[in-house]
Design a protein with these regions (language model features):
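An extracytoplasmic/periplasmic, membrane-proximal ligand-sensing/linker region
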Residues: 1, 174, 189-255
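Bilobed "Venus flytrap"/periplasmic-binding protein-like clamshell domains
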Residues: 1, 54-128, 143
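Extracytoplasmic small-molecule ligand-binding "clamshell" domains
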Residues: 1-35
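Hydrophobic residues within well-ordered alpha-helices
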Residues: 17-19, 79, 129-131
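A ligand-binding cleft/hinge motif common to bilobed small-molecule-binding domains
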Residues: 27-41, 98-104, 131-132, 136-165
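Short beta-strand->loop
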Residues: 42-57, 112-115, 149-176
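A bilobed periplasmic-binding-protein/Venus flytrap-type ligand-binding module shared by bacterial periplasmic
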Residues: 59-71, 169-192
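Second-shell loop/turn segments in exported
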Residues: 83-91, 116-117, 134-135, 184-186, ...
């Protein structure tokens, strides 16, 4: 038997927090996982598999919601220059997955929106910012739209999902799908503990929460997402070289 101590780490400055706390195991989004693969030798033990998900490697997505009366907003490209509302800057499906959709359409996600209002999981929340007109559009994470409807926090017909994917999945989405939550070991974890945790997780029954832990793939897509956003393993792409500066300002330099 092993004694387990649980420590909650803030997503902001995750790498520094991990180095400070020195955990052997982490549970996080796929985005944080691929970041720590390259930085600290993270190794997947298992990934969450939920009943409602298409598959463990295609389970997490985002929706863009607008007020139903905003007839000027019909497509994701109509959102350029508008005000966005989201949960946290580093929230995987509450922010990054949605911004990846912007990048996939050839836009710079850093400048696409004129302003972003973050709710930080407090009130006013994302739908409220959109409802009162403080934001033009909001990003919601996996199945959050359906949960808000079920609990009565938003009403049917009050909001509209932009470019909803036409599929038979349990939850609507506007974006690509990515792997679910990952349980992984860091390079410092003792081998016998990694073995014990692996056996425990992979043999754990679904239970009342209707999910289980399984081995999963699909992380190449997460690398592509993080590269398009210049985050995580690709944060170095944000370093501007002289050549980059000249190319991005060549019009001004010629005047």
């Amino acid at each position: 038997d092993y004694k387990i101590s649980v420590v909650e780490l803030q997503q902001n400055n995750l790498l520094a927090n991990v180095v400070k706390e020195r955990p052997d195991f982490l549970v996080s989004s796929a985005g944080n996982f691929v970041t720590l693969i390259s930085k600290l030798g993270a190794q997947q033990i298992a990934t969450v598999s939920r009943n409602h998900a298409y598959s463990p490697k295609e389970a997490v997505s985002s929706v863009f919601i607008v007020r139903n009366d905003r007839k000027d907003l019909q497509k994701i490209t109509d959102l350029k220059g508008r005000v966005l509302s989201a949960t946290e800057p580093h929230d995987f499906d509450g922010m990054l997955v949605g911004m990846g959709e912007i990048a996939a359409r050839g836009f710079d996600p850093d400048t696409f929106f004129s302003k972003t209002l973050f709710s930080h999981y407090q009130y006013p929340d994302v739908p409220t910012y959109v409802k009162v007109g403080a934001a033009d559009v909001g990003i919601l994470g996996t199945c959050q739209y359906e949960k808000l409807l079920t609990t009565g926090q938003i009403q049917p017909g009050e909001f509209r999902v932009l470019e909803a994917k036409n599929n038979t999945e349990a939850c609507i989405r506007s974006t690509e799908r990515y792997p679910d939550t990952v349980f992984y070991a860091l390079d410092t974890a003792p081998i016998d503990e990694v073995k014990a945790v692996s056996l425990s997780l992979l043999s754990m029954p679904k239970g009342e929460f209707d999910f289980e832990w399984v081995p999963a793939s699909g992380f190449l897509k997460v690398y592509d997402l993080m590269k398009s956003l210049k985050l995580g393993p690709y944060e170095h792409l944000r370093e501007t070289t002289v050549k980059d500066f000249i190319l991005s300002h060549q019009k001004e330099l010629l005047l």
